[in-house]
Amino acid sequence: MKINQYIDHTLLKPESRQDQIDKLIREAKTYNFASVCINPTWVSYAAKALEGTDIKVCTVIGFPLGATTSAVKAFETKDAISHGADEVDMVINIGQAKSGHFAFVEEDIRAVVEASGDKLVKVIIETCLLTDKEKIKACQAAVAAGADFVKTSTGFSTAGARLDDVRLMRQTVGPDVGVKAAGGTRSLEDAQAFIEAGATRIGTSAGVTIMEGKQTNSGY
């Protein structure tokens, strides 16, 4: 199991400085992580810095609340891709999901999928705010809309990934759609447990710590 290729090396704090983005990129190159996951303002910078490598540039859409309109999410997606994004992690409309409006949720996801062209779309359902029934319906909406992945969490709400949620999401989407566990991966053991539960990608700011076999108290 090559853990490094599961990791989206993540820095999404609003106060992130350029020197911190530089460090993230250096670490991603050192460990050959799957991607760096950064806010849209840093996409073009990271894309230039990662030219000639296999490391993807991942960014976030409708983040972290998911409450912008579908048109805005689609525009954000096109803009991010035009600046060099390879993957987009979008947040569903959580309020509409809580209202039981899953046709709306599906169309919102589809707007981003259609705007993404051939780029990878991961759908953040924010598991900590949903019931199990809502998690299942949100995952089904993501699959129906043509998304490539479902993802547990933004890292900006009340909790991150849980093993039970990853298992439920994997069971719901089947073998052909990815599952990303984000938030709460603080050690190599955590990462291995999420992978065994069905995760095919790990979103974490603790990638280096994980690779060194240590543990951190970092929140994301």
From Swiss-Prot:
For this protein, the record's SMART domains field holds: DeoC
Q: Which GO terms describe its molecular function?
A: deoxyribose-phosphate aldolase activity
Annotated Gene Ontology cellular component terms: cytoplasm
> Is Cytoplasm found in the keyword set?
yes
Task: Name the active site residues.
Answer: D89 (proton donor/acceptor), K151 (schiff-base intermediate with acetaldehyde), K180 (proton donor/acceptor)
Q: Where in the cell is it found?
A: Cytoplasm
Mark the transmembrane ranges: none
Pathway(s): Carbohydrate degradation; 2-deoxy-D-ribose 1-phosphate degradation; D-glyceraldehyde 3-phosphate and acetaldehyde from 2-deoxy-alpha-D-ribose 1-phosphate: step 2/2
Documented EC number(s): 4.1.2.4
Please give the catalytic activity noted in the UniProt record: 2-deoxy-D-ribose 5-phosphate = D-glyceraldehyde 3-phosphate + acetaldehyde
Question: Which NCBIfam families does this entry report, sorted A to Z?
Answer: deoC
Q: What is this protein called?
A: Deoxyribose-phosphate aldolase
Q: Which gene encodes it?
A: deoC
